[in-house]
Design a protein with these regions (language model features):
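Short, ordered, surface-exposed loop/turn motifs in non-cytosolic proteins
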Residues: 27-29, 36-52
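Short, acidic Ser/Thr/Gly-rich low-complexity loop/linker segments typical of extracellular
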Residues: 52-66, 70
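Short Pro-Gly-centered beta-turn/loop motif in secreted/extracellular proteins
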Residues: 40, 68-78
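A sequence-level detector for low-complexity, Ser/Thr- and acidic-rich stretches
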Residues: 116-246
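A short, solvent-exposed loop/turn motif at the edges and junctions
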Residues: 52-54, 80-98, 213
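Extracellular beta-sheet/turn segments enriched in Thr/Pro/Gly and aliphatic residues
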Residues: 95-117
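Beta-strand-rich domain onsets/edges
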Residues: 14-28, 34
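Short strand-edge motifs at loop-to-beta-strand transitions and within beta-strands
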Residues: 65-69, 108, 211-215
Length: 246
C-alpha cells in the first residue's frame, strides 16, 4: 500500500519528465531581464512561452539575465517573465501570425522591479510537453505518466481515487489564501465538464518558479478519455492542457 501524501519532485525526476524533445524549431525569442533599479542583469527569472500548438517552454535567466527560447510551429505565442517578489515590464508579450506559423528571431527584453505584494493578477501557466498540448502530469503517488486510471488499488486506505500532479508556473498562495480559492476543471471528449478537487499545492524544491498542484481524478467519467484541463484562481484562468485517462 502507498500513502496518498504527494511526494516532492526531485531535480533529477524533473529533468527526466521535462527533457526537451526533437522538433522543428521555427521561432526564437531571446533577450535580457534587468533590475529596473540597478540596470544589472536579473538571474533566476523564468521566462515562459505559451504556444497555441506546441504548448509551453521555459528558460531561466543566467547570472547576466540572458535567456533564449526556441518554439515549434505556432500561430500565436505569448511570453511572460516570472520571479517571486518581482513585477515585470512588459507584463506579457504576444505575437500572432495570420498567414502561417511564426518564424524568425524575436528579441524581447524585460525589466523587473522588486515588489513584495501582489499587484497584478495573472493567470497560472500549466506546463506541457515540448511540441505538445499534453500536460506535464504525474500520478502523485506512483510518479508515473499518463494515461491514468480513475482508481488505483495500490494507494493506502479506502480512498483509491487517483491523484494527479500538475506542474504550474507563477502560482502560489498568499497570506490568508487557502486551497479553496483554486479550482481545476476538465472537459472530456463528449464536451462534459468535470471538477478535479484540489488537495495540495507546494513549491518544487530547487525551482522556486514552479509549483506542483495535486488534484483528484474526476468522478463519473467514461474511460478511456482525454480531459482538457484548466486551473482557475483569483478570477484568472490558465492555458489549457490535456491529460489522458484509461
Amino acid at each position: 500500500m502507498r500513502s496518498k501524501c504527494p511526494p516532492i519532485l526531485s531535480p533529477l525526476l524533473l529533468l527526466f519528465i521535462t527533457g526537451a524533445h526533437a522538433y522543428s524549431q521555427t521561432a526564437t525569442f531571446s533577450g535580457r531581464v534587468t533590475d529596473s533599479t540597478t540596470g544589472s542583469g536579473l538571474p533566476d527569472v523564468a521566462v515562459v512561452a505559451v504556444g497555441n500548438q506546441s504548448g509551453t517552454r521555459v528558460a531561466v535567466t543566467n547570472v547576466q539575465g540572458d535567456y533564449t527560447l526556441v518554439m515549434g510551429t505556432n500561430t500565436n505565442i505569448t511570453l511572460r517573465a516570472y520571479r517571486k517578489g518581482f513585477v515585470f515590464n512588459p507584463i506579457f508579450f504576444g505575437i500572432t501570425s495570420i498567414g502561417g506559423p511564426i518564424t524568425g528571431s524575436h528579441p524581447r527584453d524585460f525589466s523587473g522591479t522588486s515588489f513584495p505584494i501582489l499587484i497584478f493578477l495573472q493567470a497560472p501557466i500549466l506546463l506541457t510537453e515540448d511540441s505538445s498540448l499534453q500536460a506535464l502530469a504525474l500520478d502523485s503517488v506512483l510518479m508515473t505518466r499518463d494515461p491514468f486510471p480513475l482508481v488505483n488499488p495500490t494507494y493506502f486506505g479506502t480512498d483509491n481515487r487517483t491523484r494527479i500532479k500538475l506542474l504550474v508556473v507563477d502560482f502560489d498562495l498568499f497570506s490568508g489564501e487557502t486551497l479553496s480559492m483554486i479550482s481545476v476543471q476538465g472537459i472530456d471528449n463528449a464536451a462534459i465538464t468535470h471538477a478535479l478537487p484540489v488537495e495540495d499545492l507546494r513549491i518544487v524544491p530547487g525551482t522556486p518558479w514552479m509549483t506542483q498542484l495535486t488534484v483528484r481524478a474526476p468522478e463519473a467519467i467514461a474511460t478511456p478519455n482525454i480531459l482538457t484541463i484548466t486551473v482557475a484562481a483569483r478570477g484568472q484562468i490558465s492555458n489549457a492542457a490535456t491529460v489522458r485517462l484509461k
